[in-house]
């Protein structure tokens, strides 16, 4: 009995002591001034981060009952930690001393999961977080921490169930990309479905497109995008109907299991766009569409600053912080940003945002000129008129091997449509751009900026500072060959119809553009025009300075009647133009290439009619004045015109330059200087038999392309004004023989012209031999 009593008393003492200890611990925990522990906490966290850490305000610890727990677990309280004025320091080399500052932070910690080596934070809230990110030119950055390394993986796991904050800012400075950005972030108040954001962005972006390419162009762009989206939606509905009937049950179950159904941002985009298109066309349905149950946005942001020295400002939206941790769900993002004169908008999803796995976005792009994208992206594109595009951007991120596809996009460039797919591949030593582009209706004027031949107003609009000299015709704007070495390209382009004027359509334009290590080639560049074909090749080597170029042109069966459809005088013409050119040159602009060109240019024109009005319509100032001097206002039938110029370092010398009419045989001699765009030509008319011809003295054409001067050379009669071109040659037309019947084996009415000049050449050769 004594032993039992002793044991009982001992047990009572033990229980009492434990109770006292628990009570004392409780009193200690609830009454302890945790600010005394701040030095120890600061020291431990600083050591773990490898950066200075400090709690400059109060540190408090409280206790509360857990949420969502039942049974005895509901009686195990959670510690609740609060701190104010927290900061993490930056490395010594950083421009600012603080990496992160928080006005306040509060989080709970679940106790029981600690027994299983799991840190569960039911909720964390921060107030006014500010993050400062910086990267130097040598690659050092402030967001890389030097944590203690361990050869063994940590047995601990971390889980965050809820995260909230009010108003945060992120500053980003990058010496490599020349970025200096400030991003303000805040909660949206309530989640916004991706589909709702898509519809809003679609309307906003199409209004922006109208500002660039006009309301009509934007409407055509929208109609085409809506039609394709409706087609995609119809295909999706058909597939869904087949699946619901049981034909594809297994596939549907597999898709559901892998989470592919509804995970694509483009699927949401297509469905939304199709709905808009259906509504616009007046279609109605009794069923009320269900609210999208896909990804939602939780945060809004505003960005301002500079990127690659280009001014940046815009807005955006992001998914919740917890969604970042879930690799099985797409993370939504949206942005509408203006960079200089370029505007970019995206709506879609990011897969595994912690590791930047992939993107699937709807993208809108508008700008003054596509060449301006080079500064932002490093992608070399030509100068263009204002443009707007809309399409799907998909991409996969890999270290130094990322790939992106702008898929099935539609666009407007000036007054032309443009569509297709472009792929960008990150690789060494240079990235590569490839794809196929198609234009159903291409305006000829929209091609002028590509070679710098657009108007001064157009150049000013796209920001080109090159001034075309007032006395020069050939474009002096230089090729940006330094950009050619930044990117390789393999792009095929088809223009189904190219319009210079409504009466002269060019059809079936096709070119294959290849750029490799600064060497650009268009082989071939061909199209149909005026019932014939024009085939060219261009090879531009920009790998060194100056640029080296090689060009060939072959014109076949260009019908005069179709070439000048608005000129009545030509409607009775049955002839055509055939020609060839082969030139090589060096220079960094079209004018410089012309000034150094070497090669040959030859052409035959047969069975045509010309008038002074035709010369004016063609913009041939010199020819117009010469025509008036020779023929007055009369229409003239051209039996044959033959041209064969030899180019030597920018000097064009005519081997043959002759014109055969019913009344006269006219030949031209003298050089054309492409270096200074000057002329020194003499035009010699020779009457046929006793036919009356008003002018028997030769004419001269001097001056420049821009300011030509034409007059009568009264010092010599036509019959004594030097022999016809080629009289010292055995057969000056030998080089033109291939053009007489290029492919159709029809006779060309040039026999009289050829015969007369060849006869005179033979007479002169015989006279020389007899001396």
Residue spans for each PLM region:
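Extended amphipathic ligand-handling, pore-lining, and cofactor/metal-binding catalytic surfaces
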Residues: 603, 709, 718-721, 725
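Terminal hydrophobic membrane-targeting helix
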Residues: 22-138, 395, 700
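Intrinsically disordered, low-complexity serine/threonine-rich repeat tracts
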Residues: 205-210, 219, 226-285
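Outer-membrane beta-barrel and related beta-rich outer-membrane complex signature
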Residues: 136-138, 375-377, 447-451, 609-618
């Amino acid at each position: 009995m004594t032993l039992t009593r002793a044991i009982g008393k001992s047990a009572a003492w033990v229980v009492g002591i434990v109770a006292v200890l628990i009570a004392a611990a409780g009193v200690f925990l609830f009454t302890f001034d945790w600010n005394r522990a701040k030095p120890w906490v600061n020291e431990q966290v600083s050591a773990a981060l490898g950066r200075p850490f400090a709690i400059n305000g109060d540190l408090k610890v409280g206790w509360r009952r857990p949420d969502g727990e039942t049974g005895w677990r509901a009686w195990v309280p959670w510690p609740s930690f609060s701190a104010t004025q927290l900061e993490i320091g930056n490395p010594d080399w950083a421009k600012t001393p603080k990496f992160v500052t928080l006005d306040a932070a509060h989080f709970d910690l679940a106790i029981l999961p600690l027994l299983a080596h799991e840190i569960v934070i039911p909720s964390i809230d921060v107030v006014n977080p500010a993050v400062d990110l910086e990267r130097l030119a040598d690659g050092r950055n402030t967001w890389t921490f030097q944590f203690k390394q361990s050869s063994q993986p940590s047995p601990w796991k971390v889980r965050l169930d809820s995260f909230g904050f009010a108003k945060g800012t992120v500053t980003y400075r990058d010496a490599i990309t020349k970025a200096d950005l400030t991003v303000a972030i805040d909660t949206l108040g309530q989640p916004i479905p991706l589909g709702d954001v898509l519809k809003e962005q679609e309307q906003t972006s199409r209004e922006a497109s109208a500002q660039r390419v006009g309301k009509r162009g934007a409407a055509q762009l929208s109609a085409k995008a809506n039609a394709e989206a409706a087609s995609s939606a119809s295909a999706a509905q058909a597939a869904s109907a087949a699946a619901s009937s049981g034909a594809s049950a297994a596939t549907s179950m597999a898709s559901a299991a892998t989470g592919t159904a509804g995970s694509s941002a483009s699927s949401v985009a297509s469905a939304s766009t199709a709905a808009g298109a259906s509504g616009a066309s007046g279609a109605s349905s009794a069923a009320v569409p269900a609210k999208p149950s896909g990804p939602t946005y939780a945060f809004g942001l505003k960005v301002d600053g500079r990127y690659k020295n280009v001014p940046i400002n815009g807005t955006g939206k992001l998914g919740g912080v917890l969604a970042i941790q879930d690799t099985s769900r797409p993370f939504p993002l949206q942005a509408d940003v203006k960079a200089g004169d370029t505007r970019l908008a995206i709506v879609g999803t990011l897969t595994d945002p912690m590791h930047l796995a992939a993107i699937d976005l709807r993208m809108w792009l508008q700008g003054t000129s596509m060449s301006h994208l080079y500064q932002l992206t490093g992608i070399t594109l030509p100068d263009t008129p204002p443009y707007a595009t809309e399409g799907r951007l998909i991409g996969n991120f890999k270290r130094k091997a990322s790939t992106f596809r702008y898929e099935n996009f539609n666009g407007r460039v000036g007054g032309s449509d443009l569509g297709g797919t472009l792929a960008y591949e990150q690789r060494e030593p240079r990235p590569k751009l490839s794809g196929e582009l198609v234009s159903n209706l291409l305006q000829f004027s929209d091609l002028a900026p590509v070679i710098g031949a657009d108007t001064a107003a157009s150049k000013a609009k796209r920001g080109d500072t090159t001034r075309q000299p007032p006395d020069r015709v050939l474009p002096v704007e230089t090729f940006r060959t330094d950009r050619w070495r930044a990117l390789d390209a393999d792009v095929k382009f088809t223009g189904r119809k190219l319009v210079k004027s409504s009466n002269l359509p060019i059809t079936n334009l096709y070119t294959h553009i290849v750029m490799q290590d600064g060497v650009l080639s268009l082989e071939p560049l061909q199209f149909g025009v005026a019932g014939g074909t024009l085939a060219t090749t261009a090879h531009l080597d920009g790998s060194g300075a100056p640029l080296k170029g090689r060009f060939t042109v072959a014109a076949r069966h260009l019908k005069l009647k179709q070439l000048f459809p608005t000129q009545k005088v030509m409607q009775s013409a049955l002839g055509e133009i055939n020609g060839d050119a082969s030139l090589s040159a060096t220079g960094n602009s079209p004018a410089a290439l012309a000034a150094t060109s070497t090669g040959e240019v030859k052409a035959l024109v047969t069975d045509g009619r010309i008038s002074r009005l035709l010369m004016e319509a063609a913009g041939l100032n010199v020819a117009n004045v010469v025509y008036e001097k020779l023929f007055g206002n009369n229409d003239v039938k051209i039996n044959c015109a033959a041209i064969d110029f030899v180019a030597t370092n920018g000097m064009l010398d005519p081997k043959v330059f002759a014109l055969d009419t019913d009344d006269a045989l006219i030949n031209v001699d003298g050089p054309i200087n492409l270096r200074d765009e000057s002329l020194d030509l003499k035009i010699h008319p020779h009457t046929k038999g006793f036919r009356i011809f008003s002018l028997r003295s030769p004419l001269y054409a001097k001056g420049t392309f821009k300011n030509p001067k034409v007059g009568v050379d009264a010092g010599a009669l036509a019959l004594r004004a030097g022999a016809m071109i080629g009289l010292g040659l055995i057969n000056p037309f030998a080089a033109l023989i291939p053009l007489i019947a290029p492919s159709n084996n029809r006779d060309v009415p040039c026999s009289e012209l050829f015969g007369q000049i060849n006869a005179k050449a033979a007479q002169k050769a015989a006279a020389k031999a007899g001396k």
